Amino acid sequence: MGIGRVTQVMGPVIDVRFEHNEVPKINNALVIDVPKEEGTIQLTLEVALQLGDDVVRTIAMDSTDGVQRGMDVKDTGKEISVPVGDETLGRVFNVLGETIDLKEEISDSVRRDPIHRQAPAFDELSTEVQILETGIKVVDLLAPYIKGGKIGLFGGAGVGKTVLIQELINNIAQEHGGISVFAGVGERTREGNDLYFEMSDSGVIKKTAMVFGQMNEPPGARMRVALSGLTMAEYFRDEQGQDVLLFIDNIFRFTQAGSEVSALLGRMPSAVGYQPTLATEMGQLQERITSTTKGSVTSIQAVFVPADDYTDPAPATAFAHLDATTNLERKLTEMGIYPAVDPLASTSRALEPSIVGQEHYEVARDVQSTLQKYRELQDIIAILGMDELSDEDKQTVERARRIQFFLSQNFHVAEQFTGQKGSYVPVKTTVANFKDILDGKYDHIPEDAFRLVGSMDDVIAKAKDMGVEV
């Protein structure tokens, strides 16, 4: 293996000169021994560019504090690799596959796979469509998730993406019982910490591998940690034939880290300052998240929408790869409707009669058309008031408000904040309940009884507590 010398340090980007016949390949991992107060630390770099004159430009996976010009850099001759297999379950890793949960180290005998891999070949892909029940009414009814599909949770800051992802982990991982991989990409360390302890308490952690590259880490780690998590998920799919759940929070931070690195590498920025390779990088990640004839990877990705602008290149690029989108809307959080999922903007290619069945399809479309009519009438109500509406329009508004409130739901993961038990509602119950609301069966129950409940049984119980005869 070649030995090079540091020639330049620019934050997380380091230039290294090698001998003429020893220049490392793109994506190779290099290591530097950096002296620190607590002892020598090994810093891993990844080759990003070959600049000519036997110099390579690399991205550091950790802090470059203490790195000086002239230091020796060793080429490992291989790419960054992470441990895979059953030994990863119940453990927490960083981008390099090192354990960070203060338990014993993973044995050297455990298989390690490189994080850069080709997407599965076209003839290996599976085209079967099966619905994945989440127990969340608004999702199951209006934008159902596909087993082995890619799902995006879109929303601005603080509208509930992480809470929704935690509820999905709670519901699907427990109901589905399969293996899950959670990749924390550039999000808050506190949230990752809370999630780890919650999953430990519920026992779900035994079937989960967690990989973190959080907000405080250099862009190199944030850019590569999603690939580390995906590599672990791919092993369970390809070698064990499992149906794997891959949670990524947050895919926007993957793009953001790529943008930081791109500027430091000296590439010309593209639209809104993003990297010119945005679509390529997103494609390389997303094309690997897929279902094959051996097993499936169902991915649920939180996508931060900067300034609530859906035309921003980062969320717009992610949109193109998804089978279902769950859009979170700030206006709904202001109305106290949680989860704040926009029932008209959320989409799924599974909402077809041939997939969900005729009754489910018709109820979902009727719910959406009722809500759309209500949205159109809101301007008239704001200017002239409810009294100016026809009787038919008044009925539409009243039913739409009941539907809007009934789309809200208590979450298991929010019990400590709300003091109310979470609810899991099967799809059949959801469809039947909304059909009854549309048919006017519950017009006599006040709309407040529909807020933050599970099934219609909860609404009736709440109405009785309010002193209403049901």
Swiss-Prot record:
Cell compartment(s), UniProt: Cell membrane
Q: Does the keyword Nucleotide-binding apply?
A: yes
Q: Where does ATP bind?
A: G155, G156, A157, G158, V159, G160, K161, T162
Which SMART domains does this chain map to? AAA (SM00382)
Which Pfam families does the UniProt record give?
ATP-synt_ab (PF00006), ATP-synt_ab_N (PF02874), ATP-synt_VA_C (PF22919)
| InterPro entries, A to Z | AAA+_ATPase, ATP-synt_VA_C, ATP_synth_F1_bsu, ATPase_a/bsu_AS, ATPase_alpha/beta_chains, ATPase_F1/V1/A1_a/bsu_N, ATPase_F1/V1/A1_a/bsu_N_sf, ATPase_F1/V1/A1_a/bsu_nucl-bd
Question: What protein is this chain from?
Answer: ATP synthase subunit beta
UniProt organism field: Staphylococcus aureus (strain NCTC 8325 / PS 47)
The gene name on file is: atpD
